[in-house]
C-alpha cells in the first residue's frame, strides 16, 4: 500500500496515511487518461455553430432568367450554392460533441491519474481544512506552508463554501468536492491537495 505524509493546515507533518492500493497504487494507463481527457474536453465544446443552407437563405424564390434562349447557363435560384450569397452545402449545424466512455474505462482513468500524482510525489493529504471566515490571505498562507507555488487542485469531502470562496481569487487554484473529482482537473494541476475525509470518500467510491 502506498504511504504518504499527513499534514495539518500549518504545513507540519502529523504522521502518515496509508492509501488504498487499488485506487492510488495502480500502474498508470496513460492512453486511458488521454481518452478520458478527450471525452471531457469534447463535452465542454459549445457546438452552436450554424450556417444557412439554400432553403434558409433569404430570397431566391424566383427563377433568375428563363431556361432557354438566353445563351447563359441554366439557373433555378440565385441562392443555390454556386452563387455568391447562396446557401452552404453540408455546412456546420448545431450539435453536441459529448460522448461517454464505458464506466470501467472512466474509473481506470481517474485511478491512473491519482496514482500518477502519488508516483510523482504531488499528492498532499491534510488532516482537515477549515477556515473560520472567507479569507483569501489565509488560504494563500496555507498553500505557502505546504510549499505549493504552482497550480493546485484542492479536494474536500463535501461542498465547503468558505474554502471555495477563499481560494477563488488565487490564480491556478481550483476547489472541488470528492464526488466531483475528474481526470481533467487532476491532470491539469501540478499539486493535488486532499483532505483525509476526501481520500476516504474517493476510496469508498473507486475501490
UniProtKB/Swiss-Prot annotation:
GO terms for cellular component: ribonucleoprotein complex; ribosome. The keyword S-adenosyl-L-methionine does not apply. Keywords: Ribonucleoprotein, Ribosomal protein, RNA-binding, rRNA-binding. GO terms for molecular function: rRNA binding; structural constituent of ribosome. One of its GO terms (biological process) is translation. InterPro entries: Ribosomal_uL4, Ribosomal_uL4-like, Ribosomal_uL4_dom_sf. Residues 48-86 are annotated as: Disordered. The keyword Ribonucleoprotein applies. Residues 60-71 have a biased composition (Basic residues). Part of the 50S ribosomal subunit. Belongs to the universal ribosomal protein uL4 family. One of the primary rRNA binding proteins, this protein initially binds near the 5'-end of the 23S rRNA. It is important during the early stages of 50S assembly. It makes multiple contacts with different domains of the 23S rRNA in the assembled 50S subunit and ribosome. Forms part of the polypeptide exit tunnel. This is Large ribosomal subunit protein uL4. The lineage of its organism: Bacteria, Bacillati, Bacillota, Bacilli, Bacillales.
